[in-house]
Amino acid sequence: SAGGISVPGPMGPSGPRGLPGPPGAPGPQGFQGPPGEPGEPGASGPMGPRGPPGPPGKNGDDGEAGKPGRPGERGPPGPQGARGLPGTAGLPGMKGHRGFSGLDGAKGDAGPAGPKGEPGSPGENGAPGQMGPRGLPGERGRPGASGPAGARGNDGAAGAAGPPGPTGPAGPPGFPGAVGAKGEAGPQGARGSEGPQGVRGEPGPPGPAGAAGPAGNPGADGQPGAKGANGAPGIAGAPGFPGARGPSGPQGPSGAPGPKGNSGEPGAPGSKGDTGAKGEPGPTGIQGPPGPAGEEGKRGARGEPGPTGLPGPPGERGGPGSRGFPGADGVAGPKGPAGERGSPGPAGPKGSPGEAGRPGEAGLPGAKGLTGSPGSPGPDGKTGPPGPAGQDGRPGPPGPPGARGQAGVMGFPGPKGAAGEPGKAGERGVPGPPGAVGPAGKDGEAGAQGPPGPAGPAGERGEQGPAGSPGFQGLPGPAGPPGEAGKPGEQGVPGDLGAPGPSGARGERGFPGERGVQGPPGPAGPRGSNGAPGNDGAKGDAGAPGAPGSQGAPGLQGMPGERGAAGLPGPKGDRGDAGPKGADGAPGKDGVRGLTGPIGPPGPAGAPGDKGESGPSGPAGPTGARGAPGDRGEPGPPGPAGFAGPPGADGQPGAKGEPGDAGAKGDAGPPGPAGPTGPPGPIGNVGAPGPKGARGSAGPPGATGFPGAAGRVGPPGPSGNAGPPGPPGPVGKEGGKGPRGETGPAGRPGEVSPPGPPGPTGEKGSPGADGPAGAPGTPGPQGISGQRGVVGLPGQRGERGFPGLPGPSGEPGKQGPSGSSGERGPPGPVGPPGLAGPPGESGREGSPGAEGSPGRDGSPGPKGDRGESGPAGPPGAPGAPGAPGPVGPAGKSGDRGETGPAGPAGPAGPAGARGPAGPQGPRGDKGETGEQGDRGIKGHRGFSGLQGPAGPPGSPGEQGPSGASGPAGPRGPPGSAGSPGKDGLNGLPGPIGPPGPRGRTGDAGPVGPPGPPGPPGPPGPP
């Protein structure tokens, strides 16, 4: 009976598992770690003869990845809630707006030189140069000294020979008697060796005077003097012309690889990837039986973030579960936090009508409805059997401006958001019966808000599909433009009191994401007519993780739509003439929320039917999938107030339904007769919190590494409802960026020093309370900036994570008007995973963000490709081995992307000078803590300093005589830093890691901007 507590029925089988989505875009890179300490220089070896320059040595191997950080303590899990009813597959999220790429971080200073690598093997000697042309002949030697004269007289003794030449034989003795004639001088000897002139022979003693006889015959000619020694070598000819350039010697063997370089600092986080394209809706499964509603679990204490798990492979979609028996109506569970609003899915074709549901218990009386215009009396229409859920249709073009929608329920207070424009006050919705409490939603990280998609055509209401397996939660779609105020809908029949859903286990607290770049405001879409409140469908399985989209522009605050009672939708029939108001009929079971059907011509307003008698309590039906908003019917007369039911416990927040497609504004129906004013109904249960507002765009990320200059404050996002303040986050370790070091003196290209090991990745601190702006910190040395890494694969979409690092404090946002309490619908199960869309283009670079408080060191980013070697420089003169040159300048920092999930902390590196705490930024929107995303792929380690390029071989010199090897020369000055290589190519994304631990449920964020009103839903049963 109305107000009674029903016994929960058996739990139905879960629906089929959703198909795995395509892999998401790569996740963001990690933060840049501090520079490693410089290694000690190796001892220099003796200087050998310089060979031709060998090829440049290879860069040292990258250092090992840092050790994983300590996993956070796991918070105590909350009580496990019962499994929610399976719902139809959720519609895939729309493509998120591509965020702006952060500005390139300032070029880091060169890190200290690492230890000198082992000297490379000396290159082979080059082939000797060709011999130069023969030198000119030397000058002819001067003639040698004349040989000694022959001895005078017969007995003249031969003159002493010059030192080189032998002494000529003595002339024959003369006949005694007259003095012989002087012998002729011997022929000129060959040129002597510049030896001393031979001593002139002493004249022989005169012979005894003979009798004067006849003159003797002249003495024989003396023998020619011996050939003088060779003259001194002629003067060296002028140097020959240089010989033709000899062929280059064979390339010397590559130098031995230097010592393993320290890991480079992690690259700057990559830009947030674009939201993946909207996936096709999965097939509609068979509706599973409703499970028993469990009691709502209390929220467990927030646990520390657990270690990031490796992502598991997506499971296969299970077959549809058999339809279970409907469970008995349960007591409404306590109100849970509102889930995120999903993106509108495409409208599916009209499904065939389903079986008529059993009559449900009389629901709690609804609040007094708005008085509608009197309708012309008509015959009582019969309730048609519910039709099967149609497949999700594709979003159609934006509809015409619709009427202003009713205000949604007020969400839990979120953190203080940036000042935004005040939202429009929503109209009070018709309270519905409390729905069954669904399981607690998973914590997901706040996804980037995508641009509003065009409103699709209204689909027909389809049957409820089987609940898919929990998939990855897609990114939240962008807030749509504010819709026009909708006409008050007819008061629905109170639905059955749903059984309380089980309380979900408390997820762990996810790592806080960085505040994304503030996107430009999205264009205001046409104002669609306010749709009639649709039935809350079960939340589909989470879709496969889409690539993290860039932060979309904050949309205008939309009016939350009503949450209609879930009833099995019947086929859309022609609207009959309103009959006389009958007795209130028994409330039907919550139907599946069908997709929005095509907008039909407005029918005449029906007269209120006779109130039917309360039927027997039917079993609680399964939570229907949330369909697109149906056409908004003409306002009906207010129904009589029902009996006050027992106050239901606060239910868990319902899953955020997908925003309905904007429906075309229907024609105004003829005014119906004014119905009697019913007595005021009891105060309805507090509705589930409205959909979370779009997350305000964060300011652009600062430069990688130590905190850079203060960035622009992003435009304030829409003001959300004030939420409970989050716990202050710990101060991180990030220091200020140091100035660039001076370039060392030029030397021969030094070996590539291995970079120091990366510092441990600090834990990401939760946003702390707004603190005063600190003085600028002492700049620390800039580490080598890695190439922009590929965006890592996105992790599972968890619930909204903690706010990112606080940005600059913004003005307090204006409190938007609180919406009236809407109907409290049961939260649906998680929808099926949406297909990940292709990553969007990188956004333009944002200005550097303000220095945030240092966060915990992030995990190393993915290793980037090695940079190309620089051009070869001219050969240097062979000098003594120089000291290791300083590490080349770091490459430009890549665009800073979203912060990936914190990976394991690497080994602690030398802590840089800690900069003062930056100005405390405004508290980010407190998102629901998402499940721990997949661990981002390893960030780029940064390039090792490139070895200075080898110069081209010089022209071979003239071959001179080999001199004795001289002693090793003194050690030369350190070589100049090599020119930085080009940024390497982005590495391929790494494999998706297993899914991380479940994150905690975060507090509800502020009410987001109103989404585009959906098209009017089909008229309800009379």
Curated annotation (Swiss-Prot):
One of the record's GO cellular component terms: extracellular matrix
Alphabetized Pfam families for the sequence: Collagen
Modified positions (Phosphoserine) in chain numbering: 101, 617
Pro residues: bias regions: 163-175, 670-682, 826-836, 872-887, 1007-1022
Biased composition (Gly residues): 315-324
Reported tissue expression: Expressed in bone.
InterPro entries: Collagen (IPR008160), Collagen_superfamily (IPR050149)
Keywords, ordered alphabetically: Calcium, Collagen, Extinct organism protein, Extracellular matrix, Glycoprotein, Hydroxylation, Phosphoprotein, Repeat, Secreted
Positions with biased composition (Basic and acidic residues): 59-73, 923-937
PTM annotation (5-hydroxylysine): residues: 95, 260, 335, 581, 692, 863, 926, 938
Residues linked to a glycan: 95, 938
Source taxon at top rank: Eukaryota
Subcellular location(s) per record: Secreted; Secreted, Extracellular space; Secreted, Extracellular space, Extracellular matrix
Subunit organization: Trimers of one alpha 2(I) and two alpha 1(I) chains.
Family: Belongs to the fibrillar collagen family.
Function: Type I collagen is a member of group I collagen (fibrillar forming collagen).
Protein name: Collagen alpha-1(I) chain
Organism: Mylodon darwinii (Giant ground sloth)
Upper taxonomic lineage: Eukaryota, Metazoa, Chordata, Craniata, Vertebrata
